[in-house]
Amino acid sequence: KNGFPGRILTTRLTADLMKIMLLDSAHIQESDAEYENRKGERAGREHVDPLYTEQDALDVFKYVTTCEYKEKVDLCEGVSAVFTDAGHLLGSASITLELEENGVHKTIVFSGDIGNVDQPIIRDPQLLKKADYVVMESTYGDRNHTEVWSYTDELAEIIDETLGKGGNVVIPSFAVGRTQELLYFIREIKDQKLVKSTPNFPVYIDSPLAKAATTVFCGDLHGYLDEQALELVKDGTHMFTFPNLNLVESSEESKMLNMDTTPKVIISASGMCDAGRIRHHLKHNLWKPECTIVFVGYQGEGTLGRSLLEGVRSVKLFGEEIAVHAKIVNFQGLSSHADRDHLLAWIADIKAPKPQHVFIVHGDREVAPYFAESVEKLGFTAHAPQYTEVYDLIDDKIVAPGYLPERKAKAVGGQRVS
């Protein structure tokens, strides 16, 4: 839209998911702009354009080039890229840039989000052996995940207990990756008849984006699945379908769910509860002590999801103060991010050659420098660069310092969260 003329290089399945997500986001941008313009016209404000439109999103794909894992892609003279499975989401990748100039050869690895081990469906992160420099994430750099003996058994216990009391299980979930994992586990729960109180309990997927993304997960996944998932596919098992699974289409159907008193499982986006249909379901279920809200993913600072996990007693939704009486469960083991120990194991495996410098990014402002210290204890040189910092790789020094952006206080449930 602003004149970018180059290529957008990504894995095949990331491109498939990106198209769905960009179109969904563009639709929201257009709807929000239309709403603001209706209000603004009455108030005499200037016309607002959407950040991008659905046509803009479609135009992106004129520039997209797809590749597969381990395929070397020449970007220009002396620069090539190799994508390695990061085990985070379907199609996710760490990227190794190979640079050569005047006979000098260097490699820079960008970790991207590194995945958790033993996730269903996708493979574990593929380890890398060499790099001169590494730019590495630190989402969970200060903690380890709670060990879970069986995701299926634990989730079944939560569902059984809640539905047995006549309540609903409401699961805020990311539409891509996490929702499909939940469907995988619930299929196992139903196959094994683990929910005794309501064996044929209804499950509602209330996210058009999740529905569209699931079609990608049901497509050609050659080269992306783990061994267990491959066996299921060979046996003809549909990994994400089971009896009494209901896909909610319209917003009217979504609202009707809250009029239905049948105990049920509702999976809806967004995963951090800051937007989407999940907010309606929270409004109708948070105040009920018989209901359970299950968080199955990372909750960022300042989000409604983080506030609920931290024990806020009430929240404001759609102009109403809603008391929090439902049981709040943090299903920590179910994470698509590597925890502290697995992040350290990932970087420790890069040793031929050992990186000259490791840059720690993509973590809360307290977490990134803490994790950098952990990496240094392994014998690496590491630091967490600040925003806009410029680092000279040849001279191995900071040439322009960065800064920490000011934290903005955010109102959540009538309270200021900073």
Give residue ranges: language-model regions.
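Short, conserved loop/helix-junction motifs that constitute active-site signature segments
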Residues: 2-3, 126-130, 198, 284-289, ...
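Hard-cation-handling environments
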Residues: 158-302, 316, 361, 367-369, ...
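His/Asp/Glu-rich metal-coordinating catalytic cores
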Residues: 1-181, 187-198, 202
